[in-house]
Structure formats: C-alpha cells, structure tokens
C-alpha cells in the first residue's frame, strides 16, 4: 500500500519498544519511504538533522529483535511473551556487556569493547535469555548461556557468537573465533 502524506516512526512497535539513553526517537517523512539516514559513528552519533535517539544501536536493535521474534512466532505461535512488547534499553552508559532482566539492556562502547547494541549476535543472544525465561519451563534454565548462544547461532548460522564484540581484527583461517573472546 502506498502512503499519502507524512509518516512518523518512533521505533515503538507491536513487539519492541526502544528506549535510547541518547534521547527520544521520532522521525517524520513525506511520501512512501521513511529514510532514517546513516549515522556517522557509534554510541550517540546520529545522522545530520535527526532526533537524538536515531542511533545506530536503536535502529539495529529494532530491526534485529523484531526479526528474531518473527522467526520464533512461526515455531511458537501460542507463546504469550512473543505477542507482547518488550522494552529494549540502548546506549546504557556502561560497557563490555549486555543483558536481559525482563527488558533488554545494551551498553555503549568502551573498556575495549564495541557497542553491544550494534551487534546482531548479541541481540540474538540476549533475546535467547528472554525466550528461555518465557518458554514452557519459565525461568532461566541451566545452562542459560548455552541456550542463549544456541538461539544466536541458529538465527545467524554461525558458530562465532557476538562477532565484533571486541574491536580487533581476528584471523584463524576462516574461523575468526580462534583469537577472539
């Protein structure tokens, strides 16, 4: 369907609500295409003229988490957690971690790590903790990290979870995980 007039997005959707520590997200466009721009960097960097929350991590998180939910809904259509919005907190002023505590939490870059809200494998891993907490056996089950890694590995079709967590160039003859953590 073609849109007439203006359209506005706030990245508050049916399944994911983005909350960015850099500011609120609201972008309006005329016509059928919403171009959110390209940010010039990481953390709180935004495209020229954009709202303060139009960060790389908010845009990436909204996309990646919604894709993970779409896949899961096709396998678990009766799971109520997959049908209700979850808050995702982006650019939290800390580093080298991410988490799930009923909400998703992703940290800014620093301390030798990249922004965890800009890495598809980290989104999928943290989503895996949420799914583990809301599956047929509620609560985080042992081995929780293994379950979360499995979800990320299956979605991205890779054995290296969280690639680019550390800002280093990895080698390893096709297996970039041999020197990365």
Which residues fall in each region the model found?
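Acidic/polar low-complexity interaction segments
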Residues: 1-74, 78-84, 88, 92-96, ...
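Active-site recognition of the HExxH zinc-binding catalytic motif
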Residues: 121-134, 145-149, 153
